[in-house]
Amino acid sequence: RQMCIRDRYYTYGASFGGPIIKDKLFFFVNGEYEDNVTAGSSYRPRTALGESYSGGNVHRPLQSDMDDIRSFLLKKYDFDPGKYNGYSTDTPAYRIMARVDWNANQDNKVSFRFTRTHTKDSNFPTSSTNPLYSSDLYPGGKSNEVIDGKPVGDIAKGQGRTSKYALSFSNSNYYQVRDFTSVAGEWNSRMAQGAMNNMLRFAYSYQDEPRSFDGPLFPTVDILQDGAVYANFGADLFTAGNLRQTKVFTITDEFNWNVGIN
């Protein structure tokens, strides 16, 4: 059975600029927007016991079980874990740059620049079990199911959320957000009829990289069968409160004096 999962990448952009005051003050603005839709998981559940999941995009869980889990969570906790296959996610991005140049006079020129970027990447649930070992959490076991006339037999240790034995709901995915903002300025001045030159620069940047997820906050839950994860739902284990922020401020002053050649 084939599935059609949508992928879409459109980029829109515009630039404009010109003089605010003739020969004195100028501006320039550039902007881009990316309308991105990223395909979700291509893995699908089985429709019946006995169906093979040894290859391709078929995983062990039954479609009826995944539907029952979702129905139970909606009814019992009013929590929608999302879809388990056949979905896409929106991952928009944008970039903005603005610049102003001021020719104060023939010896002084000033410029300011502003930059802002935003990206958002979709990721499947982490397979990490840190600080515990996956073999301790998922001990493996023996399956009595028969496929193509042969018993499945032993399931190895450590078969977690991303193995062929499991499926995760879409709200267990997480987004890595990257926001970057910078402001910079420059003052270039000449003195003594050009014999002296001074360049003063400053820059401030702020990088914010939080994680986010769809749906409300809900505990991470792994349902095991035969010692291996069968279904996973709830917020990604390492996403809530996970962020990285960096602020940098720099200022430099360069002075040059041309004393001539003796």
Spans of model-derived segments:
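Short, small-residue-biased leader/transition segments that mark boundaries at the very start
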Residues: 3-5
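Transmembrane beta-barrel wall of Gram-negative outer-membrane proteins
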Residues: 8-123, 175-204
